[in-house]
Amino acid sequence: MDVHLGNWRLCGRRCGRLAHVVLPEAFLDRHGLAEDAGAEFFVQTRFTGSLRPSSYVRVIGAFFGGGSGDEIARRDRRSALNLVLSLPLLADGDGRYDPHNIATLKVRSGDGRRLVFVDFFYLSLLGAQMPRGPESEGEGGKDGGAGRGDGEASRESPLERIAAEASGPGPGSGRGRSAGGRRASPLSVLSGLLDNKYTQIAKHHRALEDPGAVRGVNIEPDRRDHGNLAGVGKRKVRCALNLIDLKRDDITFTSSTHLLSGTRFTLCHYPRPVAPPGGAPWESTLDGLSERQLRGVDPLAALILGFDFLERAQTGLVNSLARECENGGLKIFQRLPVCVEKKHDIRGVLGDHFTEACHVLARQVGESCAWVRACVSGERGHVGLWADFLNLWEAGPSTLGVDLSYLFSPGPPDDESAFWARLLGSDRLLDAIKTGARAVLVVDSQLAAWLLLPGGFAIKGRYSLSREDIQITVGRYG
């Protein structure tokens, strides 16, 4: 895979290992990843003991068609969509890996408007880094005779045995190996068994003319005056690059399971040069721990840390909305002139919508929420507006992190009345608050939030984040 080789050259020295993966079409559909020629790919590590992740590392990724799963090397390239890339893995100071760390893949769309995050546990990525050892199987079967003399873990195919018998013993030749010491491919084996069909002819003979002499052409050297070399350009020297051809190596494809979604993907293991020398197995941070210490290890620690962080932010917003209602004497005001169907008990209807919206907001824990996008953009000096469109009473999935920053063009509103006037420019927002069982949360880059209920009634809240919380948000989701 050229993409895997490119990642090895790009970031191979910046990490302990690289997990080379191929994500099939079913995996892409499950995580909402569509083919995008301009997409950009970044990877970071989220640790089990800290909310602060590693810096994002940009990696090379490419979409291509052609099979999925273990048959990736055999299927037609036009049959299915796949994404191939590499995930850098980080070791601790002792060169060991925590299998419960998470490698987070961030995919940014070509237009920059959409971000998708996919989490991989190290445990599911390090499997291909441990190639199987050589089996001591001789002529008499398993443990029935002498093993391979060179101690290699390779397996002979019938074609390689035929090639070895046809070529016979010779210097540098081995069972199933070419003269260069590499495993013979089926094509090379079959080609080597074919007889030469062309007629042997002599290319030189004393009765023939010198091949370098052509009649009618002056072959005398051009005698020029080399005294003045000022106008002579520098000689261009061309040299061939020592490029590595991955086709020369045995590539092992291993199927692995994405532990969070249950979908399958493929791990590619290269003996060299994209893998550590000799394919040495990795060492775990759990090695050497006592049974008592292992009982205290939480395999979901890295995942729970991030979830709790996002949940605290959402809970803080819900509490601020509740305090605003209490401080205002449970009064709510219509901010947008939207006509709705008249009810006998409009206060009770709005109260039910507010209560349900707060419950839904408390459960909306994810990196795609409007407040996350607003926090990242505000920290980078951008002024904008984002919205979460909420479906209440389980009417359907909510749509999170919709960018409404175009409403602030060419600049932010001067006062609150201008702000509400700008919101009238969003047809999608108006459609959401014209009917029941829906609500909209609007968040600006200063983390001020407004919960819009049917009829244009609004309640203002706020995300109260410390400076450290903002830095963590930008580091993880920026």
Curated annotation (Swiss-Prot):
It holds the Pfam family Herpes_UL17. Belongs to the herpesviridae CVC1 protein family. It comes from Equine herpesvirus 2 (strain 86/87) (EHV-2). Keywords: Capsid protein, Host nucleus, Late protein, Viral genome packaging, Viral release from host cell, Virion. Signal peptide: none annotated. It is found in: Virion; Host nucleus. Capsid vertex-specific component that plays a role during viral DNA encapsidation, assuring correct genome cleavage and presumably stabilizing capsids that contain full-length viral genomes. Residues 169-179 have a biased composition (Gly residues). InterPro entries: UL17-like. GO terms for biological process: chromosome organization. It comes from the Viruses. Residues 131-184 are annotated as: Disordered. This is Capsid vertex component 1. GO terms for cellular component: host cell nucleus; viral capsid. Interacts (via C-terminus) with capsid vertex component 2/CVC2. Residues 149-163 have a biased composition (Basic and acidic residues).
